[in-house]
Each structure stands twice: as C-alpha cells, then as structure tokens.
C-alpha cells in the first residue's frame, strides 16, 4: 500500500530487481514478482504514468586500470556482507571508478505482462553492463546517459 501511495503521488520507488548479488560480471535474472507487486500497488492506489528506469552500476577501474574479473569480488556486494561493511570496503582501499548508465525508460501499466517487462529491463541492464565492462560504447539511444 505504501509503495502504491508513493507512486500515485509521483514519487520514485527504487527496486533492486535482481534480488541477489553477483560480482558485477553478469546480470542475474530480474524478479518479475517485483514488477507484479508494483502493478498491484499501482492498481490499489490509482497510480498512473509509472515508468521503469533500467539502471546499471559498473565498477570499471581500480587505481586507474580496468577492473579484472578477480578484482570484481573485492568491490562487489556479495551475500553475507552488511550494508555498513560493503560501504566501508568500497570507500577504503584503492580508488575506484564507478559508471552509472541509464537505459531507455519503460512505461508500466497494470495490464503489462510482468515477465515480459522484467525480461526487457534485464536485457537493457545486461547490454549496458557488458558494454561498460568491456570499455565499449553503450547500446541504444543517443540520450542514453552515463554519470
């Protein structure tokens, strides 16, 4: 109910749709149940004009050099780490470059197929992560942004 009211008021809701952690080399399947929960909340609260914004966060450099697969586990938030422990580890140690990429916004209605929506978002996130990890250009639109 709280999520629906928040969306109906025009506010953002942040969902980490993977629901689990990885070292940043792969994108795990996005949980379509989270899209379903958002749709249910939308219907209950009468929220309209809801948009899903696919986002990718990639640690691309360590001490100015590209991050290797082995080094990703030193940066990633993996399983049993607390938020506090993870933030402390990221902020300590070597300098890290982080890239945040925004994909194509996806309008969401209560009638959309949650599995199709989550798969489309997952494909965008995966394509952006692969491009960032390889040092390539982001796929898609001209307005695709990096921070």
Over which residues does each language-model region extend?
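Structured helix-beta-strand junction loops
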Residues: 9-10, 94
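Membrane-interfacial amphipathic helices and adjacent loop/beta segments
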Residues: 1-8
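Generic beta-sheet signal
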Residues: 11-17
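Membrane-proximal, solvent-exposed terminal domains/tails of membrane-associated proteins
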Residues: 103-107, 112, 116-118, 126-138, ...
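Long, highly charged amphipathic alpha-helices
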Residues: 2, 33, 37, 116, ...
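A cross-family acyltransferase "interaction/gating" segment
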Residues: 23-112, 138-139
């Amino acid at each position: 109910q709280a999520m629906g009211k928040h969306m109906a008021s025009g506010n953002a809701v942040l969902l980490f749709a993977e629901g689990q952690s990885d070292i940043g080399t792969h994108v795990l399947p996005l949980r379509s149940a989270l899209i379903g929960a958002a749709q249910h909340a939308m219907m209950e609260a009468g929220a309209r004009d809801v948009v899903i914004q696919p986002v990718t966060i990639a640690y691309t450099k360590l001490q100015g050099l590209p991050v290797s697969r082995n080094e990703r586990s030193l940066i990633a938030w993996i399983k049993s780490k607390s938020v506090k422990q993870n933030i402390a580890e990221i902020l300590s140690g070597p300098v890290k470059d982080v890239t945040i990429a925004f994909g194509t916004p996806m309008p969401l209605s209560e009638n959309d197929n949650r599995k199709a929506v989550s798969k489309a978002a997952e494909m965008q996130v995966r394509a952006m992560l692969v491009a960032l990890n390889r040092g390539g250009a982001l796929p898609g639109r001209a307005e695709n942004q990096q921070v």
